[in-house]
């Protein structure tokens, strides 16, 4: 049975880089994986393929929306590690709806019987405040994964996405698998948030420059690690996420905080940060 994942997070947080590396990690675990980019920039799969692949919406327009004239090889491109890649594309700037494009993408892939061929399908989705259109992949997902960092804005976006998961979970068995902290040197604010809005934290990746560089190079960390074994430990973070997802976790239907409540919680943490114990304080406690 196919497992479907939807990856969300604040714009610029590193969703696509994270998604590509998770897709490769899943492939390394022997799964046949399809990654679907849901962003008008159509750059979700760039680090898997090394170039901007044509979008489904462009292909449909070229064929005058005659689905019967489209073959799998017209829209599905092979990426690193054997991961298959699709870019939904999007409507012209300032016009149309991204949700419609996602719907057309799913419709075409079903026409091609593509969904039945994969162990895991991963949607990499644009947007940090999830409108009805870009929440569409949640209609098909078993699990949502939220990429964040240790900052106010990213966690505020995560809370909004959690609200969308709760809403979509009313109509089908969608669960939030958990948060993924990306390129952050601390996790204290993440822990503060999940103590108030309970949800798993799948992994927190440290502030590793190679993660950012991989995006510019158009390569996953796994591909970069082939020439630099020092990066193997970075790949282990993504393999750990893949293992947790493949274990079919129970997940949660989150109960998000209200905007005012969250603003108060996180801003108070900035204004009144906890006092870190010094080494001398810890020694004093040990002597008591």
Swiss-Prot record:
Keywords: 4Fe-4S, ATP-binding, Chlorophyll biosynthesis, Iron, Iron-sulfur, Magnesium, Metal-binding, Nucleotide-binding, Oxidoreductase, Photosynthesis. Binds 1 [4Fe-4S] cluster per dimer. Mg(2+) binds at residue 16. It comes from the Bacteria. One of its GO terms (biological process) is photosynthesis, dark reaction. ATP binds at residues 12-17, 41, 182-183. It catalyses: chlorophyllide a + oxidized 2[4Fe-4S]-[ferredoxin] + 2 ADP + 2 phosphate = protochlorophyllide a + reduced 2[4Fe-4S]-[ferredoxin] + 2 ATP + 2 H2O. Pathway: Porphyrin-containing compound metabolism; chlorophyll biosynthesis (light-independent). Its EC number is 1.3.7.7. The keyword Transmembrane helix does not apply. InterPro entries: NifH/chlL_CS (IPR030655), NifH/frxC (IPR000392), P-loop_NTPase (IPR027417), Protochlorophyllide_ATP-bd (IPR005971). Its cofactor is [4Fe-4S] cluster. Transmembrane segments: none annotated. SUPFAM superfamilies: P-loop containing nucleoside triphosphate hydrolases. The keyword Oxidoreductase applies. [4Fe-4S] cluster binds at residues 97, 131. It holds the Pfam family Fer4_NifH. GO terms for molecular function: 4 iron, 4 sulfur cluster binding; ATP binding; metal ion binding; oxidoreductase activity, acting on iron-sulfur proteins as donors; oxidoreductase activity, acting on the CH-CH group of donors, iron-sulfur protein as acceptor. PANTHER family: LIGHT-INDEPENDENT PROTOCHLOROPHYLLIDE REDUCTASE IRON-SULFUR ATP-BINDING PROTEIN (PTHR42864:SF2). Belongs to the NifH/BchL/ChlL family. Component of the dark-operative protochlorophyllide reductase (DPOR) that uses Mg-ATP and reduced ferredoxin to reduce ring D of protochlorophyllide (Pchlide) to form chlorophyllide a (Chlide). This reaction is light-independent. The L component serves as a unique electron donor to the NB-component of the complex, and binds Mg-ATP. Homodimer. Protochlorophyllide reductase is composed of three subunits; ChlL, ChlN and ChlB. This is Light-independent protochlorophyllide reductase iron-sulfur ATP-binding protein. It comes from Picosynechococcus sp. (strain ATCC 27264 / PCC 7002 / PR-6). The gene is chlL.
């Amino acid at each position: 049975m196919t497992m479907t994942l939807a990856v969300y997070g604040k714009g610029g947080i590193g969703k696509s880089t994270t998604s590509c590396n998770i897709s490769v990690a899943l492939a390394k675990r022997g799964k046949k994986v399809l990654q679907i980019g849901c962003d008008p920039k159509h750059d979700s799969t760039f680090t898997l393929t090394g170039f901007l692949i044509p979008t489904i919406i462009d292909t449909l327009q070229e064929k005058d929306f005659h689905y019967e004239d489209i073959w799998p090889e017209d829209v599905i491109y092979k990426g690193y590690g054997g991961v298959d890649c699709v870019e939904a594309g999007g409507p012209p700037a300032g016009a149309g709806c991204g949700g419609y494009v996602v719907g057309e993408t799913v419709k075409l892939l079903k026409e091609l019987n593509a969904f039945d061929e994969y162990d895991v399908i991963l949607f990499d989705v644009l947007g940090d405040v999830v409108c009805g259109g870009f929440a569409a992949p949640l209609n098909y997902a078993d699990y949502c994964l939220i990429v964040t960092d240790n900052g106010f804005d990213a966690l505020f976006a995560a809370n909004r996405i959690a609200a969308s998961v709760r809403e979509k979970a009313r109509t089908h068995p969608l669960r939030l698998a958990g948060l993924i902290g990306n390129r952050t040197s601390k996790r204290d604010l993440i822990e503060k948030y999940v103590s108030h809005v309970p949800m798993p934290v799948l992994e927190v990746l440290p502030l590793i420059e190679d993660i950012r560089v991989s995006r510019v190079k158009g390569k996953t960390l796994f591909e970069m690690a082939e020439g630099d074994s020092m990066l193997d430990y970075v790949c282990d973070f993504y393999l750990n996420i893949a293992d947790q997802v493949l274990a079919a976790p129970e997940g949660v239907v989150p109960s998000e905080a209200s905007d005012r409540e969250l603003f108060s919680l996180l801003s108070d943490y900035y204004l009144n940060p906890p006092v870190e114990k010094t080494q001398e304080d810890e020694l004093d406690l040990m002597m008591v």
